[in-house]
Each structure stands twice: as structure tokens, then as C-alpha cells.
Amino acid sequence: MPALKFFFEALFLAAIFILQALCEPQGSKGVTSRFVRKLQDSGDLPETSEWFITFDATLNLPEQVHLTQGDYIGQTTTVSWVTWASSSGNIVQYGKSKDSYTSSIQSDVTTYTYGDYTSGFIHHAKLEGLDYGTTYFYKVGDGSSSREFSFTTPPEVGPDAAHVFGITADLGQTINSAQTVAHYTRSGGQTMLFVGDMSYADRYKSNSQVRWDTWLRLLENSTAFQSWMWVAGDHEIEAKSNSGETEKFKAFNKRFPVPYQASGSTSSLYYAFKRASAHFIAISYYDDYSEGSTQYQWLQTELSKVDRSTTPWLIILEHVPWYNSNTHHYQQGDGMRSVLEPLIVNAKADIFFAGHVHAYERTFRASSLNCSGGCSDENAPVYINIGDGGNSEGLVGSFVSPQPSYSAFREASYGFATLDIRNRTHALYNWHRNDDGDAVVADSTWIINRVSS
């Protein structure tokens, strides 16, 4: 039996290598998809839409429930929610059996104002010391004003820890956004990586903060059951001098408790965490990234901590693309890339996820260290732009021509991606197009880890 098992494992790996060669043969040309999405309304869903999970505020039921990894290594989960009538009900009870809660913790409670808006009571509770690979049941709130959910913790950090990550950005709250979220909840994804531009509340004249409430209601069927890891984009800045609000990222910082301090960062805009077999580093275009800056020095330090024998996958999260052949935001990220690319390539990062451009694009491994504008570099990451979540600004379908040699596949459609990390050497990447309401895999490739393979 051991010999037979070895045979099938060898056969499986051989098939992967063949598929990889077929998908991305050396010197292959990129593809510009000819798919044209059927036009439909891209305006925001009304505040009373059935897509938003809403309760009578006087009942003080927890709403907008969302989970975030709360530490560096995946043994803490932060539970966040909102109540409206009072700050009471600030309890999370949890345990390994349904209706049998062996632990409880009180939440920290905060509020904020923005213009004439006052938020509900925003709760954050850290569930610490959790066992890896374990399903926990939890209840938020008290008595009749409570709700119950469950989540499964990630596997212990290690080189062959398998895990399925979802990736999206620029989501908004249109019918297209709702379809993206609904498709993702059925995809088998276990942790979502969100690379910026969230509610698009700033599309409203007064930066309508109510749209943060509706947006989190839209997501709850996923966010209450698995961690979403957040990266801020330009639509989270929300500081407008004519509104009297000058504090940047106010709603982001109040609502989304990313674990930046756990990685020694002093800002929620850039931080790192480990999950399964991957080491994630989120960096920010919207903070000083110049050589010698606080962010630059932090990134240098964090990259020096990466242990590829423990976390063979090194994945970068950042909102503005460094390689983008769409005419929208074309070359916007070049300045940041020129400063930080040497660090990223020297570290042999595997994948770089970005958003910002409302279309989809995947590149071959490329850098500009030995050329201008991007050429093949096996030490460089695969760049994936996933700013196609569904927001009200719509799609941008104009790409530069001819297609640059670094560009492998590009299409202006709504959708999301999954990264199925199988082991230390192989991950199956799929981009799921929202094909007129159905989830369709439109781009698929095996990504081979260059350090471990």
C-alpha cells in the first residue's frame, strides 16, 4: 500500500507539471478575453434591499457580524458586530459544541461620528488561544438579543498546511457585488483576502456612513463564518475638507481591527500575518513608502522574518497595481514599484494581489529590475489585479495594445478569485467570472512555488 500511495502521489505531481507547462509554456503570449458582459444596472442597492441582513434596532440584536484574524499566527479570532439600542449585549460565548459554550469574553465597545452620522455601538472581542483546525460555535449578545454562528480555525502554521483563500477588491454594494459575495460563499473559500475599496460610501456627497452599515450587512453570510483580512484602498480615506472631516481612514479603523501591532507595525495600513502555509504582507500606497520611511523599514524587517521552511508561500497584498495594462490607472503604481520592487523580488515573493482597476488581469512572473516596463523574471511574483468585485463605478474595458509581454490574461468582467494552496510547492489559482449571474471559472493556472519546488 505505501508503494501504491507513492505511485499515485508521483503521478499527481507529474500531471501538475504537465498542466503547468500547457497553461504557461515558456515564451507563450498573453490572452485578452473577448467576453463581453451583458449590461445591467450597476447602481447601489437601495438601503432597504433584501440583500442586507437587517433587524429592528430596538431589539438590540447584533448585526454586521464579521471575523478577522486577530494575531500573527492564526490562534486568535476577533469577532466584531454592531448593536443600536445600547452597548449592552457585549458578550461572546463560544465553545467546540453547538449550544455548549465553555468560554466567554466581553467586547471592547466604541462609536464614532462623521458629520451628522453617529455609528451604532461597534463591538470587538478577541477569542484567544484557539486550537488550530477546529470548529467553534459562538453566540454574540445576551439572552433573546443574541445570535449564533460558527467558524473553523486555520490549520497550524506549517509548510504543507493546505488552505483555500478567496481574493476580491473594489466590491461596493450593487447587484453585481451581491452576486460576487453569493458566489464566493459557495466556492469553498476558507479565508477572504480583501485588497481595498470596500463600501464606496465616499461616492455619496456626504460620505454616507449608513453605507458602511448596509455594506457589512451584505457581507454577513460570509464574514460571520470565516475571517476576512482587510487592506485599505483610496475609497477608505474619506477625509473631505468641505465636510469638516479631516481624519483619514476613520471608518476603516473603527470597524476593521486588523492585527497590525502583532507584526510590529504602527499603522493599520500595513501589517503581516501567517495563515496555514503562507506569510502575508500587506503594504500601502497611501502611506509614505519612500526609502527610509517607517513603512519601508518595517517591510525590510518583516521580510527578514520570513521563514520559507515554515511558510513557503510569500504573498503581498496592496491596493494599487504595479503591473497593469488597462488604460485606467495605467502606470499609477510605478513610483511605488520602483522603490519597493527590489525588496519584493529579492525575497522571491510568489504572488502580489492588487485591486483599484475595475477589471481583471494576471501576469507572468515579471519585474523591471533588468529592463523597463516589465520582463520575464523567475524570481518575481505573479501579479494579479482583482479590482472587479462589482462596485457602482462600473467596469473599465480599455486595455493598452499590443498586450505587454508580462500580461498573461485580462478581461473586464466582475468576479473573484480563489487560491487553493495544496502544499509547499503547488497552489491552484482560479478566477471566477460572474457570467451573467453564474460563477464561471474563466482563468485557471497552477502556481509553482519557486523556493520549495
Regions found by a protein language model. Give the residues of each.
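Conserved, compact domain cores that house catalytic/ligand-binding motifs in diverse enzymes
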Residues: 161-231, 236-237
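Active-site-proximal segments of metal-dependent phosphoesterases and phosphodiesterases across multiple
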Residues: 309-352
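Acidic, histidine-bearing metal-coordination/catalytic regions of metal-dependent phosphoesterases
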Residues: 2-167, 186, 412, 418-422, ...
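Short, solvent-exposed loop/turn elements at domain surfaces
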Residues: 75-78, 88-91, 101-102, 174-177, ...
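Active-site neighborhood of phospho(di)ester-bond hydrolases with catalytic His/Asp-centered motifs
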Residues: 167-169, 192-197, 228-234, 284, ...
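Alpha-helix termination/capping residues and helix-transition junctions
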Residues: 86, 186, 222-225, 308, ...
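Short, solvent-exposed loop/turn segments at secondary-structure junctions
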Residues: 86, 144, 199, 236-237, ...
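Extended active-site neighborhood of metal-dependent phosphoesterases/phosphodiesterases
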Residues: 121-128, 132-159, 206, 210-309, ...
